[in-house]
Amino acid sequence: MAALQLYIPFSTGPCLSNCRFRSSPVRSSSERQALFNRIAPVYDNLNDLLSLGQHRIWKRMTVSWSGAKMGDSVLDLCCGSGDIAFLLSEKVESNGKVIGLDFSKEQLSVASSRQKLKSKACFMNIEWVEGDALDLPFSNGHFDAITMGYGLRNVVDKHTAMREILRVLKAGSRVSILDFNKSTNPVTSSFQELMIDNVVVPVASGFGLEEDYKYLKRSIKEFLTGEELEKLALDVGFSSARYYEIGGGLMGNLVATR
Ligand SMILES: C/C(=C\Cc1cc(O)c2ccccc2c1O)CCC[C@H](C)CCC[C@H](C)CCCC(C)C
Ligand SMILES: C[S@@+](CC[C@H](N)C(=O)[O-])C[C@H]1O[C@@H](n2cnc3c(N)ncnc32)[C@H](O)[C@@H]1O
């Protein structure tokens, strides 16, 4: 039987949440793009609520480990609604330049609205680019630092994403990648699953986004451990790679130097 794709009006992709006929998990790039478009209106508030504001600390650590400094030209990959790009902007100041890249129009629209509401002059140094992390529209060796928050786990081809990051980084520069930690400690991974099943998904279901947040647990299961992420970075050609567990082991950060 031919594959049946259901579309809901005004959505950018197939019907995934609240859809009785939903059959496959969020596998393709366009399904993931549709998911992030759908959750954009509530994404920031849910992150604050679900992490009790802790994600702000993890994002600050990510920026600090990227080595970004005043005057730098930096890239925030999979920038979503812009949290990390705004932090980078304060770091590189008005004579620096920040590019926030994402493939979700809705997330970028939230980022751009937030930028307009901010009063600090440095925030004018941010440019939002709609693009694909797997095919970056930048020349080789362009950036002094790159950050990526909760992005690598969500791209369909992690190897290509890391190769693209390496390509657009200057020699000696760093990428700092924040994400959920796929822990090898059974106590930590059970606690993470417990939080997702009993807090994250029930809260999200109150916004009609149960299926979209269920994807989170599957994506962590299919992600790489810290050791595997270090290996991936070295395999694609980074000269060094170090993984740090943070947030009590729930989160992790990969720092790799070109
Ligand atoms: C930062 C959070 C979520 C980001 C996020 C990432 C994704 O890839 C998604 C994909 C699809 C849908 C949504 C998302 C998404 O929102 C929130 C993280 C919340 C944690 C699961 C729970 C944190 C629990 C504690 C309150 C933290 C305690 C820390 C302490 C130091 C032990
Ligand atoms: C969980 S959000 C993280 C947003 C933000 N970095 C943060 O930390 O809050 C993941 C983001 O990755 C983006 N994304 C996933 N795959 C992508 C790809 N191939 N190219 C560009 N953006 C992508 C999604 O659109 C989404 O905005």
Predicted regions and their residues:
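Conserved alpha-helix/loop element of class I SAM-dependent methyltransferases that forms part
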Residues: L52-S73, D83, L87
